[in-house]
Amino acid sequence: MVAYFAYGSNMDRMQMADRCPDSVVVGPATLPDHAFRIATGGYATVVPSPSDAVHGVLWHLPETDEASLDAYENLASDFYRKIECEVTDGDGVRRPAMLYVASDPTPGRPVPGYQEKVVAAAIEHGFPAPYVGQLSGWIPPR
């Protein structure tokens, strides 16, 4: 099993059940000294940012689900790359985890419907209201 830190649409339980059917949600976690961004491709990434933190969801993935997620996140195209990090779980315990970051973190606009899914998942997992507000700020005006 690998620990996976999701901070974008993979926080959504139904999406993960479809992509990684044997995944198990551990619970909310935070990635210190990073900030959430939408990259130029229209999807989430994180960037180093001292004193900030990214809220997300920690999952346990068996190797088969990790391979499926690698394919879904299109590592071969170099849009995302997989890195190792250390997150803090809901009990304050620091844990090693992997996550995907955009190879090009240049800021962009979310693809239609993407950020709304991220915000809904953040609310479902009980993230702090100020953080949900920050995520909502990435939703383009209609």
Language-model regions: role of each:
Residues 1-142:
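Glycine-aromatic micro-motifs
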